Amino acid sequence: QVSDGASVVSVYPGVRVALVAVQRRLGADGGVVMEGRDIGTVVFPDAEIKVFLDASLDERARRRFEELRARGAGADLESVRRAEEERDRRDRTRSHSPLRAASDAVVIDSTGIPADEVAARIVQLVQRRLRA
């Protein structure tokens, strides 16, 4: 619900400006990990490490469907897929901070990869970058 709501209200530039200011205050001292569709391009464009997680539409819909099902929420896979597709369309085409990977982000396609393996890859990336 939070992700969907954020996508809906983020089309309003005034809302985005206010939320970006809050996020920047939270991360002002560094040493934070943040997740979001424009964290690396708008909120923290100078972040030391940026990861852009991606997955196919079908994979993301399946994951969301499983998450909803585990919580006991009634949903069917096709409606979840359509909702994900609409969210992508809305986020990619908004005029203010559209969804895109930062040019210096490491892109990880997590399609078919378990969450713990994706997390391990990110931890390895961070460890390598911090040692460099």
Language model regions located:
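ATP-dependent small-molecule kinase phosphotransfer cores
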Residues: 1-32, 58, 62, 66, ...
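Short secondary-structure boundary/capping segments
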Residues: 24, 41-43, 97-99
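Short glycine-rich anion-binding loops that position phosphate/pyrophosphate groups of nucleotides
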Residues: 38-40, 57-58, 113
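H-loop (His-switch) and adjacent beta-strand-loop-beta switch element
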Residues: 53-54
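C-terminal alpha-helix
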Residues: 121-132
